[in-house]
From Swiss-Prot:
Organism for this UniProt entry: Arabidopsis thaliana (Mouse-ear cress)
Compositionally biased intervals (Basic and acidic residues): 454-463
InterPro entries (alphabetical): Frigida
One Pfam family of this chain: Frigida
Coiled coil start-end: 9-102
GO CC, one annotated term: plastid
Keyword Coiled coil: yes
Keywords linked to the UniProt accession: Coiled coil, Developmental protein, Differentiation, Flowering
Region listing for Disordered, in residue ranges: 454-494
Organism classification: Eukaryota, Viridiplantae, Streptophyta, Embryophyta, Tracheophyta
Superkingdom per UniProt: Eukaryota
A GO BP annotation: cell differentiation
Family to which the UniProt record says this protein belongs: Belongs to the Frigida family.
Protein name: FRIGIDA-like protein 3
């Protein structure tokens, strides 16, 4: 600003300088000895032109300076807004982290209170508590607890020992006996019989494991038969039983993980002894080659085999014995399962999740990618809205059979069904993660209504026309045919008399002769003027011997 003021002052002094120059020029002109080729007017115009150009340039510089100041101020305001947004996001992230931390602490404290406050059966009169029940828990698992007589680290007197803590199984007391007897087969059958109550089972099995002498060995025993020795058959029931058994194996390993998470380091070292880990590693090494034949696309993110393998590594803490790259290849095979995020954390793969999510996106599993992005707080790197829109585009994309515009009706139905399923899946994902503000669901609901209406209309158009039912008749008397037709009537009902009688030819009407007809009086003889002889009256009985209401006789004409 000081330079600007100095330049302005110099420009203001230009007029005075010109006046001084004029005086000097007048003095020079007064001296006749000096001849000048220039006139004063020309010099004056020249200097005024210089003055105007300097002022114009000065104003241009001022405008540029103001523009620069405006841009600088806007940049500072934008920087402050971004800084405030970052601070707000950091604060929100810290609040979410604090909430999760508080929830985890509350869950841990609740579990500890539940275990500590659970009632323990008191000894009867005359009995004494076992010695290891009153010892301090830090002395129970001393170094001499694993000896030659107890190489597997079997927990002794676990029912009342503070090693495993207090426990109480309320809903299913049978679990205590099965776990106490180390009966893995019976445990499988019990879970299969009570599969409708899996939620309550999963709460009580970890407590029931405390009754087992070695819960880790019990779970490993339950894994026998996960891959049956006989070749799979086409028997659907057997396949369903195998799937149920595999789900039970996974649930038992998860329950064991819940039990182990509540133990201290010394107790954990006893339950997961070296022999137990070696046995688990042997099972995992036997399963690993069988996973190579699995197809990621065919598994559709819901592979029980891959889930069981990863859960085995996480539960028995043998992840370090296997390559990380091989484990990462199995994550997309279990991405649809609800335990996928927790399983990845247990395996120590949280830092590798961006690469896993990228693989899911490239393989068309955007919904699973969104779920994992929220689970690991990677929504800034992977936008959920963009992934959901990409999923809908994939759902509407044409298949190899053709394009939706010129496809056959069957292929068009397939396109519509795929889009309908995709829309419902996206809406469910939006509602689960509260993305309604970022991705409104009203247009999606409208599109679903259009597709369902078109589907219903097409279904009605392709259905065969059903014959219209006949109008119900009123109650009519039933008659039967002659004796020859009785045996041929398969319905067992008589013939229904139609609403209209047939037009009979009275001259040729048949009649029955016999005692019934003989009892009727003979008709009077007709006059001689008639040219025809009417048939004799036969009363109100017809040829089938059933009474009927005969119409009046026709008039005679003379």
């Amino acid at each position: 600003m000081e330079d600007t003021r100095s330049v302005a002052s110099l420009m203001d002094s230009t007029s005075s300088k010109i006046q001084q120059l004029q005086k000097a020029f007048a003095e020079l002109e007064s001296q006749r000895a000096v001849t000048l080729n220039l006139k004063w007017k020309e010099l004056e115009e020249h200097f005024h032109g210089l003055e105007r150009s300097l002022k114009r340039r000065f104003h241009e510089l001022e405008d540029q300076e103001k523009e620069y100041e405006t841009k600088t101020r806007k940049a500072q305001e934008l920087l402050e807004k971004k800084k405030a947004a970052v601070e707000a996001k950091e604060k929100a992230a810290l609040e979410r982290l604090q909430k999760k931390r508080d929830a985890a602490m509350f869950t841990i404290n609740s579990a500890l209170d539940k275990y500590n406050n659970a009632p323990v059966s008191k000894p009867s009169v005359g009995e004494r508590w076992p010695q290891n029940a009153v010892e301090d828990s830090s002395n129970v698992f001393a170094a001499d607890s694993i000896t030659d007589d107890n190489p597997d680290g079997i927990v002794q007197d676990v029912q009342i020992s503070p090693v495993m803590g207090n426990y109480e199984v309320k809903a299913y007391p049978q679990l205590l006996k099965l776990c106490g007897d180390m009966d893995s087969t019976g445990l499988h059958k019990f879970v299969s019989d009570n599969r409708k109550n899996l939620a309550s089972l999963k709460e009580e099995i970890p407590m029931a494991f405390r009754a087992a002498a070695n819960p880790a060995s019990l779970v490993l025993d339950s894994l026998e038969g996960f891959y049956p020795m006989e070749a799979p058959t086409a028997d659907g029931k057997k396949d369903a039983n195998l799937l149920g058994m595999r789900r039970t194996c996974i649930m038992l390993m998860e329950c064991l993980s819940i039990l182990l998470s509540g133990l201290d380091r010394n107790c954990l070292a006893v339950v997961l002894s070296q022999n137990v880990k070696h046995r688990a590693k042997t099972i995992a090494e036997g399963w690993n080659p069988l996973l190579e034949s699995l197809d990621m696309d065919a598994c559709n993110g819901n592979s029980l085999e891959a889930h069981a393998f990863l859960q085995l590594l996480a539960t028995f803490a043998i992840v370090a014995d296997f390559k990380e790259d091989e484990l990462l290849k199995l994550i997309p095979m279990v991405s649809r399962r609800r335990q996928a995020a927790e399983l990845c954390r247990s395996l120590g793969l949280a830092e590798k999740m961006p690469g896993v999510i990228e693989v899911l996106v490239n393989s068309g599993k955007q919904i699973d990618a969104v779920n994992l992005a929220f689970a690991f707080e990677l929504t800034e790197q992977f936008s959920p809205v963009s992934l959901l829109k990409s999923y809908l585009i994939e759902a509407r994309r044409s298949s190899p059979q053709g394009r939706p515009g010129n496809a056959s009706p069957a292929v068009q139905d397939e396109f519509n069904e795929r889009e309908l399923i995709g829309l419902k899946t996206v809406i469910k994902c939006i509602e689960e993660h509260s993305l309604e503000e970022q991705y409104p669901v009203e247009p999606l609901h409208k599109r679903i209504l259009q597709l369902e209406k078109a589907k219903a209309d097409k279904k009605r158009a392709t259905e065969p026309m059903k014959p219209q039912p006949k109008r119900p008749r009123g109650a009519q008397p039933r008659v039967t045919d002659n004796n020859n037709n009785i045996n041929n009537n398969k319905t067992g009902y008589g013939r229904v008399i139609p609403e209209r009688y047939p037009q009979y030819v009275y001259d040729n009407r048949p009649f029955l002769s016999g005692p019934i007809m003989a009892a009727q009086p003979p008709p009077p003889p007709p006059p001689q003027t008639y040219t025809f002889n009417p048939a004799p009256a036969h009363g109100n009985f017809y040829a089938n011997c059933y009474q009927y209401q005969a119409p009046p006789p026709p008039p005679y004409f003379h």
